[in-house]
């Protein structure tokens, strides 16, 4: 029997906390979060994610974090979605997401910034601060042009970095996701991400992809079926 529901699985993470969500017909159906460090075992990781999905669930899309973030969680997410693709869901569309792009979309949604505004997207994990610059091009949530590679930068040197792009703290809108928001208190126009709203952004993406509302140009911000991690620095063991 043909499946009449449109189901999407979301696997989001950058730190020790992994968020799983099942979206049915553009509505959030269920959510689970767990700490991958409490039981630091890859088999347990695979089991928890697999148990979240019913064997009878037909998935149209899988949205998953490619990074940047902690090496351990990014490696495990990538390994899991590869296994899912080749073992059970060969017809499912797998769409990798840049965490920095997602939080830039969060700023665009929550602050309703004007066209052509520059966005400094910052993700903090442990002692690392991953950054990327975007520019809003038109009145559309996902119409963000990426202007830089992902960098891992000491925030004390952020103005120097912005200067290489003829920007400064004064003329960018910044958005921050991480455990230490006080470290960006000196930023002008800074928005702190409420992690609970991240799923809202990804569900919006899911809905627009299902309904063919995202142009090929904007689609470049996604990393469909490449399964490439975005570490932002040389891999280690964190």
Over which residues does each language-model region extend?
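Short amphipathic alpha-helical face segments that pack within enzyme cores
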Residues: 44-47, 79, 83, 102-105
């Amino acid at each position: 029997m043909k499946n009449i529901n449109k189901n999407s699985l979301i696997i989001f993470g950058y730190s020790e906390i992994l968020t799983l969500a099942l979206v049915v017909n553009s509505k959030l159906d269920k959510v689970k979060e767990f700490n991958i460090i409490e039981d630091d075992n890859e088999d347990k990781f695979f089991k928890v994610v697999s148990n979240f999905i019913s064997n009878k669930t037909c998935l149209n899309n899988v949205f998953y974090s490619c990074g940047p973030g902690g090496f351990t969680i990014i490696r495990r997410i990538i390994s899991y979605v590869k296994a899912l693709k080749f073992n059970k869901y060969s017809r499912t569309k797998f769409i990798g997401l840049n965490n920095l792009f997602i939080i830039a979309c969060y700023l665009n949604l929550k602050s309703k910034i004007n066209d052509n505004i520059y966005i400094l997207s910052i993700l903090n994990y442990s002692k690392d601060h991953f950054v990327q610059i975007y520019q809003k091009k038109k009145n559309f949530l996902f119409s963000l042009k990426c202007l830089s590679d992902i960098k891992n930068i000491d925030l004390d040197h952020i103005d120097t970095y912005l200067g290489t792009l003829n920007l400064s703290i004064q003329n960018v809108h910044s958005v921050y996701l991480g455990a230490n928001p006080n470290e960006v208190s000196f930023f002008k126009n800074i928005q702190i991400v409420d992690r609970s709203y991240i799923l809202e952004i990804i569900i919006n993406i899911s809905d627009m992809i299902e309904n063919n509302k995202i142009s090929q140009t904007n689609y470049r911000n996604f990393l469909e079926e490449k399964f490439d991690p975005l570490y932002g620095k040389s891999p280690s063991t964190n």
